[in-house]
Amino acid sequence: MSLWSSVKFAQRYAQLPKVFYRLVTPQPLDNSRWVIWNGELAQGFALPKHADDPQLLSVFSGAEPFSAFKPLAMKYAGHQFGVYNPDLGDGRGLLLGEMQNQQGQWFDIHLKGAGLTPFSRMGDGRAVLRSTIREYLCSEAMAALGIETTRALGMTVSDTPVYREQVEQGACLIRLAQTHIRFGHFEHFFYTEQYDELRLLADNVIEWYMPECTAHDKPYLAMFEQVVARTATMIAQWQAVGFAHGVMNTDNMSILGQTFDYGPFGFLDDYEPGYICNHSDYQGRYAFDQQPRVALWNLSALAHALSPLVERDDLELALAQYEPTLGKVFSQLMRQKLGLLSQQEGDSELFNAMFTLLAENHTDYTRFFRTLSQLDSEGAQTVIDLFIDRDAARGWLSRYLERVALEQTASGEAKSAQQRCEQMRAVNPKYILRNYLAQQAIDKAQQGDFSEVHTLAKLLKNPYDEQAEMEAYAHLPPEWGKKMVISCSS
């Protein structure tokens, strides 16, 4: 039986007019070999669990032409740090084609680091080992956290030198996503006044990903309303888990509200609302607490690009749903994290007091929620000890426990402390991809040892489980590992 006999492939984007993309032959790296293969994900597409067959490597590294693929570089534009840039496109990644999973969903196959394209501008079309490791680990960690995201099927390393601040090893990521269509695709056709192509793009987004919009009397408006709702939900998830993306340009915003293009990202260590993870973000435009505002700005930019298809008043009404949706989803997530099942008056004040307390005491965000979810077994003092101002912590904890008791009285369903805490542990991760953990894996990998990449990948598949033998990975970061800022260079 052929390696590919059970895999279903398609090339829908390649059927669009040539103005949407350029066909490009991948430029394979020298002596490519696997760093890691995501066997569990692969099986969902009828691919083997283990990457033993050499054809897997040669096809997915771009070294061997494959009849089911039609490699292409997408053309798009975008606002970068608020400034429109018309000269964007896939500069080092190629859309190879699509695969269908066992649930019948189609996923793009994208090879990141595949070489020069017509859109490479001053770049070399390559990706380096460190950034590829970070994207592989984080996209899979986010999926395990239940956050909408692209996925990583595998990654390779090579002997090809790549020149950045220093000479580094070239690597490739095999990224899967339900789509690689970005806000910037629509911006490109709008600003170049290619309105027929703009309409065709919207038609295909609806046909491929949002067929329910066709029943709407204004299908393009229905599409935009979905983008608004999905984006608001994604941002609420980011804020709840403490994830900072770092470079929320419109060309990095997925039309399906999926976390896209992992670059200088970071998870909060100490709760610092103004946390900036991208060292190129001098003004803090993409700081953690600015992400909700920036997402709305980006949606407004998309709305402008859709103005030939949708009435302005309709676009404004759709945009007006962003903040209520974000607030509703975020409040739901916060209640889940605190073990509160019902909505009560005063919840916002309780949340705000908690965030103020966390910020003033520089308390670790993930550790706080995980410790709070162990209140049944560890007791209140373990929570209080996380804070410098223990009296303030004691006061907030008293308010919190009163709120828990109020909910039980109001609902008439008194959950035990153990039941509540078990539910909290299912939504408050013990393990996240802290930047220092990723850096330790990168340091080893650059010496040819990929064991830590595999260890983290396995650990982060089950972030809510105790995994007692992995306890060291739940420790607070060392001083050198706190507030790391990451370069966009990759």
Swiss-Prot record:
EC code(s) of this entry: 2.7.7.-, 2.7.7.108
Role noted for this protein: Nucleotidyltransferase involved in the post-translational modification of proteins. It can catalyze the addition of adenosine monophosphate (AMP) or uridine monophosphate (UMP) to a protein, resulting in modifications known as AMPylation and UMPylation.
Top EC class for this record: transferase
Keywords of this entry: ATP-binding, Magnesium, Manganese, Metal-binding, Nucleotide-binding, Nucleotidyltransferase, Transferase
Disulphide connectivity of cysteines: none
GO molecular function: AMPylase activity; ATP binding; magnesium ion binding
Keyword Nucleotide-binding listed: yes
Transmembrane segments: none
Sequence positions that bind ATP: G89, G91, R92, K112, D124, G125, R175, R182, D261
Organism encoding this protein: Vibrio vulnificus (strain YJ016)
Pfam families per the UniProt record, alphabetical: SelO
Protein name: Protein nucleotidyltransferase YdiU
Record: residues binding Mg(2+): N252, D261
Residues making up the signal peptide according to the UniProt record: none
Catalytic reaction list: L-seryl-[protein] + ATP = 3-O-(5'-adenylyl)-L-seryl-[protein] + diphosphate; L-threonyl-[protein] + ATP = 3-O-(5'-adenylyl)-L-threonyl-[protein] + diphosphate; L-tyrosyl-[protein] + ATP = O-(5'-adenylyl)-L-tyrosyl-[protein] + diphosphate; L-histidyl-[protein] + UTP = N(tele)-(5'-uridylyl)-L-histidyl-[protein] + diphosphate
Family statement: Belongs to the SELO family.
InterPro entries associated with the record: SelO
Cofactors required: Mg(2+); Mn(2+)
Active site: D251 (proton acceptor)
HAMAP family linked to this entry: YdiU_SelO
